[in-house]
UniProtKB/Swiss-Prot annotation:
UniProt KW Membrane keyword: no
Pfam family, one: Hfq
RNA-binding is among the record's keywords: yes
Gene symbol of the encoding locus: hfq
Protein name in UniProt: RNA-binding protein Hfq
Annotated source species: Ruegeria sp. (strain TM1040)
Assembly and binders: Homohexamer.
Biological processes per GO annotation: regulation of DNA-templated transcription; regulation of RNA stability; regulation of translation, ncRNA-mediated
Record's function text: RNA chaperone that binds small regulatory RNA (sRNAs) and mRNAs to facilitate mRNA translational regulation in response to envelope stress, environmental stress and changes in metabolite concentrations. Also binds with high specificity to tRNAs.
InterPro entries: Hfq, LSM_dom_sf, Sm
Length: 79
């Protein structure tokens, strides 16, 4: 069933959250944030760095770049 399949955004965010991979988040105004994603929902991401948490609204995010390569769908086509 197609609705059982997780969307790419949720799969990506869940993977970096579970594995605690550090990320760099670029906002649409050019600001660069770095840290570990500890939580997310449909509207925002919680980013933690040096014991501080930042609530970042998804509509302000341009790009999320993990600090290391990640593999989301092992064994599947790269399509």
């Amino acid at each position: 069933m197609a609705s059982d399949r997780q969307n790419l955004q949720d799969a990506f965010l869940n993977h970096v959250r579970k594995t605690k991979v550090p990320v760099t988040i670029f906002l649409i105004n050019g600001v660069k944030l770095q840290g570990v994603i500890t939580w997310f929902d449909n509207f925002c991401v919680l980013l933690r760095r040096d014991g501080q948490s930042q609530l970042v609204y998804k509509h302000a995010i341009s790009t999320i770049m993990p600090a290391q390569p990640i593999s989301l769908y092992e064994g599947e086509d790269s399509n």
